[in-house]
Structure formats: structure tokens, C-alpha cells
Amino acid sequence: MCSSDLSAAAGELAGWADHPAGRLGLILLLDQLPRNLHRGTPAAFAQDDKARALCLKGLSFGADRGLSPLARVFFYLPLEHAESREQQARSVALFEALAAEQAQGPARETFEGFADFARRHQVIIQHFGRFPHRNAILGRESTPEEVAFLRQPGSGF
């Protein structure tokens, strides 16, 4: 882990959350950075709860509304990564609303793609209650149905 990743995980950068851009920075450090630095290990998901809490708290007072549409995509990703049906529903609603806001703009297809990706995540959680592609990494036993799903092309992210 890099020093900013460790500092964010330890709560040392909590003051950043006082401003929308700082809150987004913390979300990126806790959600995206671990997924890329620690891909294939449990550490990739270790800060998900913290990132999700920052996202949800920010949503409660509209912190996302002060960000650009593309920045909001990253603000919402902790919900898309959640193994929770409720949070997946919220993710889809947010991404669909964002796509609707961009419906007349030049990035329409890009934002429709983000909404589609959120829906794909939601379908998996609705069916399994978790992301089967994380099972081996997190030491969870896969069900026969999950194993069959994982053998399908395009089943992972």
C-alpha cells in the first residue's frame, strides 16, 4: 500500500470528507486504489466498508451534486461494488439518473454504459447475494451454481 492509501485506511485523512472533491478523493483512495494495487488479493476489498460509508454519508447531504458527471461515477462506485441488494438498487438508480442527465449530451453513450454496468452488477447480487468472482480471493466456498456461472464467458468484471 502507498502512504496515502494507508493514511486513508487509518482515518488520517478524514478532514478531506468536509468537501465534495476531498470526499471523492477519499473514496478513490479506499475503493479504486486497493482494487488496482491489490488485485487478486483480499486487500483489494478491505476498505470497501469505509468507501461505502463515505459515499452514503455524502449522498445524505448532496455532496455528489457538487461534482462533475464523470466524478460522480467514481463517487457512486462503492455502491456498485457492494454485496447488498439494497445498495445495488441505489447504485442503479444513481447511475440511471446520471445517464438521464446526460441523455442529450455528447457523452450519452458513455453514461448509458455506466448505467448498464451497474445493472449487470445488480443482477449478480440479486441472484447470488454476493459476487461469485470474489469467492476464491476471499476464501469463500462457491456453490455449484456459482461455479457454473463463473464458467460462462463474461461472468466477471
Which residues does each PLM region occupy?
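C-terminal accessory segment of soluble enzyme catalytic cores
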Residues: A100-F157
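Helix-adjacent hinge/juxtasegments
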Residues: L29, N36-G66
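Structural motif
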Residues: A14-L24, A63-L70
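Short alpha-helical scaffolding segments that buttress acidic/His motifs in well-ordered protein cores
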Residues: L28, F74-P78, A118
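Short, small-residue-biased leader/transition segments that mark boundaries at the very start
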Residues: C2-S3
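Conserved interaction-surface patches within small, structured recognition/assembly domains
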Residues: S7-H19, R35-R39
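A contiguous pocket-lining binding segment that forms or flanks enzyme active sites
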Residues: R52-A103
